[in-house]
Amino acid sequence: MKKYLLLLALCFTFAALFAQPTNTNISNGVLFDGEPYLAMNPSNNQNLVTAWMGMKFSNGLFRIAIKTRASFDGGNTWSTVNTLPHFGLGYGSADPNMAFDANGYLYLSYIDYKQNPDSGGIYVARSGDGGLNWDTPSKAFDMYDVANKRPIDRPWLVVDKSSTANAGTLYITTKPAPWIAPPNRPYYKVSSDSGHTWTAIANIDGTGYLTGNSITAPMAAPVTTIDGKFCAIYPSYVASQNILPCYYFASSTNQGQSFNYNLMYATVPAGADTNLKSGYQLIAHPSDANKLYFVGPVSQNQDADIKALNSTDGGQTWSGPVRVNDDPLGNGKSQDMVWAAYNEQGHIATVWRDRRNDAATGFWNIGYDFYYAVSDDNGQTFSTNQQMSSQFIPFDSIVAENGNDFLSAVYSGDTLYTVWGDTRNGKLNIWFAKTIASTNTTVDVNILNESNDLFNLFPNPAGRQLQINFKEDVVSLPIEIFNMKGQVVYNLIVSERQNSIDVSQWQSGIYLIKIDGKVQRFVVD
């Protein structure tokens, strides 16, 4: 109880567990924040990083830029916002995507481009400190890598975390820009030097397993497996290959030099509301290379449902679709904007946007919530659906626009971390939820305000000495320093404006200093 009261007083970790979900506005943008991504460090599950598209005024223009924040305490507090650079006058950014390697080195890919004249590409930045800082991004794809196809839309970045010869290899999949008419193909590139250089662009589909001439946006959903394979699922419609529209599963053991192909799913298509966010995802079990999970919205039974398919033989064969959402079948309430994640034990959490709580049906003027379900058997069955958003969100026409097509989640132990965009406050912002999945309880999160008018800390990170300089004279002012467990590790009383603390023997990590009600974070390295 003492520890609970201490952390509550500091407003940086658990406030309480509530039956009613709690959500935190993590972006606080003035107009538009969209399409967030969330990554967890495999070498430190308390290190989370989120990235999103946010409006920024720069050089006399309002442009979309990629913004990031990092957490080192499981999402209880977050760093100040970083902004990734643009690479041309009038450029805007989109589609952030991140991946940690097995050692905790973080990569971020994003688009930076403009139209008329078309220019730009896909860029990759790197962070060696858990997402606090980024190096200068390098270009992975150019707008003109394929003549007239502009292959820079919806890139997905994955990193090989295996202990095979492919360990550390980066892969990016992409597709032609939205304004490019078919025939189109899914593309990819490979990097073996942390994303500084890339192979020539190539297509994932192959002879006998072609995408075809009628699919406008053939997105490839990639993943790497624990045995060193690069895999992707992509759509196809070629009647000579299969009389039905279908998805193919491609896998490579040699860093994309060649692929094996298997049919994943084929079906008679049903009409779908094109306003729905129909993106799909492929994920791989963290310790069993045979287990894979594919999920996306499927418009049948008079509305869109979240459907999942799974494989237990490395993608050679797949189950039939399993309905994840448990509202009444065919009730006209559509689900979309889906994401999923395995935890360390191989359980799966699936999250999505859900309209079941609106009295009306359809898309326009229909409010929504966010829900999740858990599977303990690789997607064969699912738990009762649970609401994750803290309130019903009224419809706003901005949800029909581009730039808010995906949400994101990571899953560790029994804790589900999720980010999404919604319009509950009259603008599109990014919201964060930290949910104990088995009990559907959420942890109230406060974003630590690290600016104050009382004192400055430097250097930060500190190696030997931490300087505490006050902006005004002080008299007998107590200082307390806490570790991330909420324990007091140091205290003193100061009466000087300039003070120094020897931290050379302290354990490396993140600490919080509390002075006169002000709390600031610092790092000892």
Question: Which residues does each PLM region occupy?
Answer:
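C-terminal outer-membrane/trafficking sorting elements
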Residues: 4-6, 11, 15, 447-525
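Intrinsically disordered, low-complexity regulatory segments in eukaryotic proteins
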Residues: 442-446
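Extracellular, repeat-based ectodomains that mediate carbohydrate processing or recognition
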Residues: 20-441
